[in-house]
């Protein structure tokens, strides 16, 4: 068995990994969870728009990154639950993405998105990657 396989076999399966995130303007922290690649793919697929080029007769799919980020935040946020109908009704909206837009200021959304990206392993900084590549 190679070293990577040994390492993987020794690791515990991480389930329900969560982290608390302090968001300015809210007295209590938000709780976000990690998602799986399968969940992420499913969310990404719902955010794709397929276009057909008549000249080349080719189909291409483009992902709406803003919609993907909103849906990823909604899926990963345990508390508050953006899918809660009562909370949506209080803000006068329908849907988790609409609630996020109504409830959070742009800076608050970015802070929450960064926490979601970090817990899901998207935290690699380009400067860090560049430094690693140089060495």
Outline where the language-model segments fall.
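Extended acidic low-complexity intrinsically disordered regions
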Residues: 1-15
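Short, surface-exposed, charged amphipathic helix/loop patches that serve as local interaction elements
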Residues: 26-135
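Short acidic-hydrophobic surface loop/beta-edge motif
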Residues: 16-25
């Amino acid at each position: 068995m190679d070293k990577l396989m040994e390492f993987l076999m020794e690791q515990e399966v991480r389930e329900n990994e969560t982290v608390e995130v302090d968001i300015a303007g809210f007295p209590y922290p938000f709780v976000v969870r990690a998602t799986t690649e399968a969940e992420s793919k499913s969310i990404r697929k719902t955010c794709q728009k397929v276009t057909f080029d008549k000249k080349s007769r080719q189909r291409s799919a483009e992902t709406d990154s803003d919609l993907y980020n909103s849906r990823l935040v909604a899926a990963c946020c345990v508390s508050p639950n953006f899918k809660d109908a009562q909370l949506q009704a209080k803000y006068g909206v329908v849907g988790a993405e609409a609630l996020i837009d109504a409830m959070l200021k742009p800076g608050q959304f970015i802070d929450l998105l960064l926490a979601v990206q970090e817990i899901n392993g998207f935290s690699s900084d380009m400067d860090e990657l560049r430094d690693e590549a140089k060495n």
